[in-house]
Amino acid sequence: MQVSVRDNNVEQALRALKKKLQREGVFREMKLKQHFEKPSVKKAREKAEAVRRARKLARKKAQREGAL
């Protein structure tokens, strides 16, 4: 990953880098990889995340249809 530093503004470059890493999911992946996660626990977590995403999508869809 590459971020350009303009006008010696390192703080702005760090913010841009952090935003890119956040979008890529690097911080989340690092947090998950700190400790070993049993395959059964990983499977349950991923299933719960999928259910959460589906509910969120259904909520948004229902809200959009209600507004129309």
From Swiss-Prot:
Cellular component annotations (GO), alphabetically ordered: ribonucleoprotein complex; ribosome
Keywords associated with the record: Ribonucleoprotein, Ribosomal protein
GO molecular function, one term: structural constituent of ribosome
Pfam families, sorted: Ribosomal_S21 (PF01165)
Taxonomic superkingdom: Bacteria
Classification via InterPro entries: Ribosomal_bS21, Ribosomal_bS21_CS, Ribosomal_bS21_sf
GO biological process, one term: translation
Keyword Ribosomal protein: yes
Keyword Ribosomal protein: yes
HAMAP family given in the database record: Ribosomal_bS21
Protein family (similarity comment): Belongs to the bacterial ribosomal protein bS21 family.
Protein name as it appears in the record: Small ribosomal subunit protein bS21
Taxonomic path: Bacteria, Pseudomonadati, Pseudomonadota, Alphaproteobacteria, Rhodobacterales
UniProt gene name: rpsU
